[in-house]
Amino acid sequence: MSGTVMQIVRVAILADSRLTEMALPAELPLREILPAVQRLVVPSAQNGDGGQADSGAAVQLSLAPVGGQPFSLDASLDTVGVVDGDLLVLQPVPAGPAAPGIVEDIADAAMIFSTSRLKPWGIAHIQRGALAAVIAVALLATGLTVTYRVATGVLAGLLAVAGIAVASALAGLLITIRSPRSGIALSIAALVPIGAALALAVPGKFGPAQVLLGAAGVAAWSLIALMIPSAERERVVAFFTAAAVVGASVALAAGAQLLWQLPLLSIGCGLIVAALLVTIQAAQLSALWARFPLPVIPAPGDPTPSAPPLRLLEDLPRRVRVSDAHQSGFIAAAVLLSVLGSVAIAVRPEALSVVGWYLVAATAAAATLRARVWDSAACKAWLLAQPYLVAGVLLVFYTATGRYVAAFGAVLVLAVLMLAWVVVALNPGIASPESYSLPLRRLLGLVAAGLDVSLIPVMAYLVGLFAWVLNR
């Protein structure tokens, strides 16, 4: 029974010109007993004095002998040699790297100073878990209500989805003021119920009208999220930019299908054209959306323009980061649009001509060659991923619809792409532009330009534009 008794030590603690005697556990780390010590020796923190509480949160405190250095927070009073009757001082831990911890065994040291012990479970983990639970429940409830609405056609399903969408949107807007990161996560999750609610709001069988309203809602909410100021806005500018561009493009494609009953091949060509336009204008649009100051070039004889305001110059680094994020979002949207267009063109492989297959392959090759132009790692990654995304989506679709020969062809394409990546990884010089001679660079640029130029005539031929002009 004596082994279960906790050893204590009676000490006097001096803090803020106040001497307090107390009995403390001798075998617990100081990190665990200091919060209680601070509450006892600094009573102002309990009386609502915000200054003491804030300073305690900003400056880490520890016990120390009079005139000595603070003890390590991972050491116990017994380890540092504190005995009954000692006088200790509660003082801040000096800034800089922490002193080596005091341990009695190397195995204890390996465990005490491991990453999991230095970053233990805390309130931040509980908050993240609560946020993840809220998002998961919202998404699962959205899936349930959408399924219920589609299966039964009852109005209650639509009202439930609309309620989830409104609650998610309001939560994202309101929580962003207090916790920007949590609010942004909720804003991203709100895209699903918003799109689902607007799509289900259109009566009738699922078709272009539902896609039009759902995509328009996703684009509108993405633009709203981009306009909301927050401390974490720069982290999600790329995501909402891509969502807005893809949503607007898909909405336009669905509107064209709704008005003119276009074939799926024409819709795919239109999406590829939109992807090309977004890619070409990505740099200009990103600078415009980041609100870069327009250059003022005076004409000969005009007075020299005044210097930009200091506040504008100080804000330029932030605008550069925002512009880079917008650019990554535009490139990601262009890649996703080209993937959607290629899949729409090749969705029926048995009815697709050689020209159609050339368009799919040329679009992928042009995106890969276009990656050499961009310095951003995110832009390069998206452009190089375009062939994989197209082949992967087609593989899943062909397998699901029983087109196993076409699915086997998609697997072969993925295998060839994988071998290409392995070869480049083993020979890094292939991916280094400096290793290419000037004639080879010109040849590569000529091939890329030829692929880009050939896309528009091929798409015009596929949609029947040439035949329409000749048969007028």
From Swiss-Prot:
InterPro entries: T7SS_EccD, YukD-like. The keyword Cell inner membrane applies. It is a multi-pass membrane protein. Induction: Repressed by IdeR in the presence of iron and by Zur in the presence of zinc. One of its GO terms (cellular component) is peptidoglycan-based cell wall. Keywords: Cell inner membrane, Cell membrane, Membrane, Transmembrane, Transmembrane helix, Transport. Its main location: membrane. Part of the ESX-3 / type VII secretion system (T7SS), which is composed of cytosolic and membrane components. The ESX-3 membrane complex is composed of EccB3, EccC3, EccD3 and EccE3. Was identified as a high-confidence drug target. This is ESX-3 secretion system protein EccD3. It comes from Mycobacterium tuberculosis (strain ATCC 25618 / H37Rv). The gene is eccD3.
